[in-house]
Structures are given as structure tokens and as C-alpha cells.
Amino acid sequence: MMRALLCFVLGMLATLAAQGKPLEFQKVENCRWTANRWNDGDSFHVITGDAGREIVARLYFVDTPEAETAYRDRIDEQGAYFGITREQTVAIAHEAAAFTAKRLAAPFTVWTRWRSALGRSALGRVYCIIITAEARDLNELLVENGLARIYGTRTTLFDGRDSRKYLARLAELEAQAKREKRGAWRFVK
């Protein structure tokens, strides 16, 4: 199943590349976060406002820790980034998931190119940038609160900004979170 999905996605990308058409961002408004046991801080189920279909959104540019303890190597890698223990990393994972759910309680906007983020969901995951009801970038909120590391795939943003400038902005927010001992940074001596 996953192999077939991957082949399909790669085939679509190859077709678009052959046609010389870049994948443009699409704006999907009035989206709703929906509960699912696999939701975490950077990957979660969404009901789209346009067609009411369910997708799994995976944030571009950031990575929140895993709460599922079966992924020990990944948790250890994420903890090493922050300089914290496995237990602290899992605690931050739960905080990040709750933070995201709270921030997305009101309808929000999804910007996506419908690029596959792989993953284990039967729905498939697509990379997204999320703008909250308060017009805040969810990536920035997670990083400035010490709940996510700067990580993941890179792309030009929906508003045309270069990813290097955006990543520099995230780095500023991360430095501030470290100084103020927010989120995972509170555990660092």
C-alpha cells in the first residue's frame, strides 16, 4: 500500500516536472483540527474547509518530539537536539500536542502544495504551513515556546519568502526561547 502510494506521488511529481509546472501553494480556509490518537504537535488530522475531507497535515520546517515511546531512537535524537532526557522529551511531546490542539481550536488556514510527507497514515500526510485564527504561524509559535526544533523539508513559502530568511526568523525565535527557558529549554542547565 505504502509503496503504491509512493509510486503514485513520485509519478505525479515527475509528470508535473516534465510539464514545467511548479507545484503552487493552495490556500484552504476554515479548516478544523480533529481528534485522532496519532495527532502530535507537528502532524495532525484536519477537516478541510473547502470539501470537508480529512487530511493529515505535517508541518514544514519544524519537528516536535514523539510521544510514542516505541520510537526510542527518534526520541533520543530529538532529545539530543535540546540536550534533555528521553523522559523530558516525551513530556515535551505531550505539551506540544496539547499546544497545537489548543491553538487550532478555532478555524484556521492551511497552505499546502499537496506534497507527500510520507508517514504511516492510511490517509497519507501532506506538508503544510498553518496560520491560526489569530493570524499566527504555527511553526513560529511552536519554536518560540520551545516545543519544536527547526527541522524538516525546505520550500519557498506561500507568500514568496525565501526559506533561508524564514529559517533565520525561526532561529531568532529559538534563541529567545532558550534565553527565556521555555518548553524543552527549561530542562537545560
Segments from the language model and where they lie:
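Small beta-barrel nucleic-acid-binding modules, primarily SNase/OB-fold domains
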Residues: 16-189
